[in-house]
Every structure is written in C-alpha cells, then in structure tokens.
Amino acid sequence: MAQEFVNCKIQPGKVVVFIKPTCPYCRRAQEILSQLPIKQGLLEFVDITATNHTNEIQDYLQQLTGARTVPRVFIGKDCIGGCSDLVSLQQSGELLTRLKQIGALQ
C-alpha cells in the first residue's frame, strides 16, 4: 500500500513533497515552493498523516531515499532531500534550473 501510494505520486515533470502539517520544516518547504512560478497542477503537497499508513510510508521513503524524515522533496522522479537541501538548491540557483529541466515552470 505505502509503496503504491508513494510511487503513484512521484511522476516525471511534477514536484511532489511528502509532508506532515505540524512539521515546521515541511511548512518552510511549502512556503519556498509556493512562491515559485510552478505551472498549475505540477506542485503537490502530500500529507502523509491523512492516511492510516504514516509509518509504512515513512519506512518506504527510507528505503527509496535513505531518509524517513519529512519533508521529502521530489523534482520529477529525483528526491532532492529535505528542507535544508531545498534551501541550498534555492540559494545556489540550482532549484530553478532543476524545475526548468522538468518543464515545471510557467
């Protein structure tokens, strides 16, 4: 269930962030990405606590990305990491480059 749930969310050309709404790092990642000119429908925040499988989802994220913490940010099919990784990419200018590469920017 967790594997199918995660895999069906992660798609080429899309930005997906797995979050918990109470997590301050998740909120920060949401703020950063929401301010960018990402095309309608290509940015999705997935609240893993809205399922009854939070632990299983985090276990699968661990298997997939090497970390079970949230946020887990995917640009296309690539996991770029968490909030600090997102901030680093933003500061270096690499974030916009990666978003352009997958065709997610307006």
From Swiss-Prot:
Belongs to the glutaredoxin family. Disulfide bonds join 23-26, 79-83. The modification N-acetylalanine is found at residue 2. This is Glutaredoxin-1. InterPro entries: GLR_AS, GLRX1, Glutaredoxin, Glutaredoxin_euk/vir, Glutaredoxin_subgr, Thioredoxin-like_sf. GO terms for molecular function: glutathione disulfide oxidoreductase activity; sodium channel regulator activity. CDD domains: GRX_GRXh_1_2_like (cd03419). One of its GO terms (cellular component) is extracellular exosome. The modification N6-succinyllysine is found at residue 9. PROSITE patterns: GLUTAREDOXIN_1, GLUTAREDOXIN_2. Has a glutathione-disulfide oxidoreductase activity in the presence of NADPH and glutathione reductase. Reduces low molecular weight disulfides and proteins. GO terms for biological process: nucleobase-containing small molecule interconversion; positive regulation of membrane potential. Keywords: Acetylation, Cytoplasm, Disulfide bond, Electron transport, Redox-active center, Transport. NCBIfam families: GRX_euk. Residues 3-106 form the Glutaredoxin domain. Pfam families: Glutaredoxin (PF00462). It is found in: Cytoplasm. It comes from the Eukaryota. It comes from Homo sapiens (Human).
